[in-house]
């Protein structure tokens, strides 16, 4: 298994043979953390959509819909993009539609992969255990912020990579891994000091 890391959506097109790889989409603040929370709170499914207009179509059909653009909750949606808004008593048993600036765009970009996995610090152990047992190359795909690299997504990529041998990782993965090793003991404070927190 080889692990490569894409630190910005603008680099995603450089991935070769994507249909043979597993892509872990990472948008720590906040889409993938929100998706993980929605599912942990009992939703039957999360439907990620890139376009706000498609999310509105789902809303008109009675679905619960959440999302943001530029960090602001979309007017008329049931929720924003904070995991804390998706309470168990509201989302349990429901299909929830989510549309965000960065994360859902990246999920759609990765849709031609062999498989797409959602990664957040909330499900880190599950993600690592899952991909560890696959016989597929893995792409850690950081959503970043507006096509730019961000620290929180890079740190998660590094956290995943720290469970694998360095020889199996490309340079970007090794950089993320090294950044994580520096921040690991003080992760929450490091995340609080990111531009996007």
Model feature map: region roles:
Residues 3-4, 21-24, 44-47, 62-65, ...:
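Structural motif
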Residues 100-101, 120, 142-144:
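Short, structured patches in soluble enzyme cores that scaffold and shape functional sites
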Residues 72, 78-115, 129, 151-197:
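Long, charged alpha-helical interface segments
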Residues 117-118, 124-131, 136:
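Nuclease catalytic cores that cleave nucleic-acid phosphodiester bonds
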Residues 143-153:
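Phosphate/ribose-phosphate-bearing ligand recognition and processing surfaces
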Residues 139-145, 168:
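Glycine-rich anion-binding loop/nest that anchors nucleotide
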Residues 4-17, 31-39, 43, 53-96, ...:
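Residues that scaffold, gate, or flank divalent-cation-dependent active/transport sites
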Residues 26-33, 50-53, 101, 122, ...:
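Conserved active-site and cofactor/substrate-binding residues in soluble primary-metabolism enzymes
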């Amino acid at each position: 298994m080889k692990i490569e890391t894409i630190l910005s959506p603008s680099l995603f097109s450089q991935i070769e043979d994507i249909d043979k790889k597993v892509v872990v989409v990472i948008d720590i603040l906040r889409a993938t953390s929100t998706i993980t929370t929605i599912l942990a709170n009992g939703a039957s499914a999360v439907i990620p959509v890139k376009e706000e207009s498609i999310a509105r179509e789902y809303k008109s059909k009675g679905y619960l819909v959440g999302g943001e653009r530029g960090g602001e909750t979309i007017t008329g949606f049931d929720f924003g993009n904070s995991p804390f808004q998706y309470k168990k008593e509201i989302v349990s048993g429901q299909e929830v539609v989510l549309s965000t600036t960065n994360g859902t765009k990246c999920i759609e970009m990765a849709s031609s992969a062999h498989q797409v996995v959602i990664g957040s610090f909330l499900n880190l152990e599950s993600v690592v255990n899952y991909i560890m047992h696959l016989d597929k190359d893995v792409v850690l795909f950081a959503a970043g912020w507006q096509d730019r690299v961000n620290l929180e997504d890079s740190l998660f990529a590094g956290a995943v990579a720290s469970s694998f041998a360095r020889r199996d990782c490309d340079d970007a993965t090794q950089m993320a891994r090294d950044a994580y090793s520096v921040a690991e003991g003080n992760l929450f404070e490091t995340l609080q000091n990111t531009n996007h927190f």
